[in-house]
């Protein structure tokens, strides 16, 4: 996701006096103000953690990261385990739990699914506001007895995905997973809410070809790209094959076989 466009006016807001110190800390870290005239978004700090709220009469509800309850918990318990398409795409199999870099982490949903299945995950989210939501969600989840051991496998990195991949230090990830923002329209309520919120902040990933090139250069075993089902492949080398679902597909770029 692209860095925050300057046109968006964002303030940090404490949802109660007791959260003012934390709000000040987030404002300082992110270079945001506590008071902004005609703000379009509020990064709110309250008892449920950090959340991003679009302002205005037609704004959807707040977006926050919650790995303990809600959709993440339901998918963890009932989501299909290693039979899920994303698991097959990254190469999860009997005795195989690859080390995965999710270079477009967003709110961490796909990374959490893979961590639940036992994969060691590195995550990069280059949009600072979304990265802050993810950092806060991981910190809260770490305190939960059931979910804590799962998020302990999720390691959040800060910075630009392409630069971090090009300058990677140490053992490379076996699999790199990409889900670039694509200018498409879907009708589910969840997509509406999150995409309506994020699109003004992050735009589309116009550097997706460079993202793919950096991933192919770094990954030791394969690169997986999630796309809307009918969207074209990312410009560049073509995938060897794909897995297709109802609304999305996974383009797979293998380099060598994953073995137990």
From Swiss-Prot:
Function per UniProt: Specifically methylates the guanosine in position 1516 of 16S rRNA.
Residue numbers binding S-adenosyl-L-methionine: 125-126, 179
EC identifiers of the protein: 2.1.1.242
Keywords noted in UniProt: Cytoplasm, Methyltransferase, rRNA processing, S-adenosyl-L-methionine, Transferase
One Gene Ontology cellular component annotation held by this UniProt entry: cytoplasm
Annotated localization: Cytoplasm
Reactions it catalyzes: guanosine(1516) in 16S rRNA + S-adenosyl-L-methionine = N(2)-methylguanosine(1516) in 16S rRNA + S-adenosyl-L-homocysteine + H(+)
Entry's family note: Belongs to the methyltransferase superfamily. RsmJ family.
Annotated protein name in UniProt: Ribosomal RNA small subunit methyltransferase J
Record organism: Pseudomonas fluorescens (strain ATCC BAA-477 / NRRL B-23932 / Pf-5)
Matches recorded under SUPFAM superfamilies: S-adenosyl-L-methionine-dependent methyltransferases
Keyword rRNA processing: yes
Lineage, broadest ranks: Bacteria, Pseudomonadati, Pseudomonadota, Gammaproteobacteria, Pseudomonadales
Pfam families membership: SAM_MT
Gene that produces this protein: rsmJ
GO molecular function, one term: rRNA (guanine-N2-)-methyltransferase activity
């Amino acid at each position: 996701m692209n860095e925050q466009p300057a046109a968006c006016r964002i303030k940090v807001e404490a949802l109660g006096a007791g959260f003012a110190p934390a709000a000040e800390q987030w404002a300082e870290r992110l270079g945001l103000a506590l008071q902004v005239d005609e703000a379009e978004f509020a990064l709110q700090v309250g008892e449920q953690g950090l959340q991003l709220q679009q302002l205005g009469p037609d704004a959807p509800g707040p977006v926050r990261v919650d790995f303990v309850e809600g959709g993440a918990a339901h998918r963890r318990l009932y989501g299909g385990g290693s039979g899920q398409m994303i698991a097959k795409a990254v190469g999860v199999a009997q005795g195989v739990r690859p080390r995965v870099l999710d270079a477009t982490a967003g709110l961490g949903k796909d990374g959490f699914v893979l961590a639940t299945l036992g994969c060691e995950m590195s995550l990069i989210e280059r949009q600072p506001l979304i990265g802050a939501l993810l950092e806060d969600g991981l910190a809260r989840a770490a305190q939960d007895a059931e979910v804590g051991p799962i998020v302990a496998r999720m390691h959040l990195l800060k910075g630009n995905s392409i630069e971090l991949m090009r300058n990677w230090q140490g053992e490379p990830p076996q699999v790199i997973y990409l889900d670039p923002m694509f200018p498409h329209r879907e009708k589910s309520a969840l997509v509406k809410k999150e995409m309506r919120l994020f699109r003004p902040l992050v735009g589309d990933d116009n550097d997706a070809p460079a993202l793919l090139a950096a991933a192919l250069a770094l990954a030791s075993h394969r690169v997986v790209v999630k796309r809307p089902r009918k969207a074209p492949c990312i410009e560049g080398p073509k995938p060897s094959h794909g897995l297709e679902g109802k609304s999305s597909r996974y383009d797979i770029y293998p380099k060598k076989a994953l073995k137990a």
